[in-house]
Amino acid sequence: VPGRQRLIRCGAITTPAGLPLPARLLQISDDMATLLRQFKPDAMAVEELFFNQNVTTGIGVAQARGVILTEAERACIPIFEYSPSQVKQAVVGYGKAEKRQVMDMTRRLLGLKDVPKPDDAADAVAIALCHARSASSRLSLLDSARPGSGRYAVRDNRR
């Protein structure tokens, strides 16, 4: 159906728990670079980082996120950031929706039998839907080739 989003593939990059942090970050970097080369996305949408109660986990997530953003920048892929309430608003229509509502609406919008698994992949699909459904994303994507546009300063190395 023209104009309707469809899920091509989703998943999560995982690393062995016993691996030292630098090796885990390198694996995430390598896996991300491979995915970006394979799928050649037009843009990357990420959720704003916030620390809940476990700061130690948050620091690890921030380090992994930094590696992922670096690989997107290296591949000249524009990066767009959304708050959790923006994702909820775009997917459900209510910025304070519960996680289960977001997951169910994600499933319904994409015509899926089940919610994507694992939870991190389901969250990523909802963030991608938020970007696709954001009216400004179409304009932002067109403007993203200009240095300094958008939430992040995006270099255009494709010239």
Regions picked out by a protein language model, each given a short descriptive name:
Residues 1-159:
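Phosphate- and other anionic-substrate recognition elements at nucleic-acid/protein interfaces
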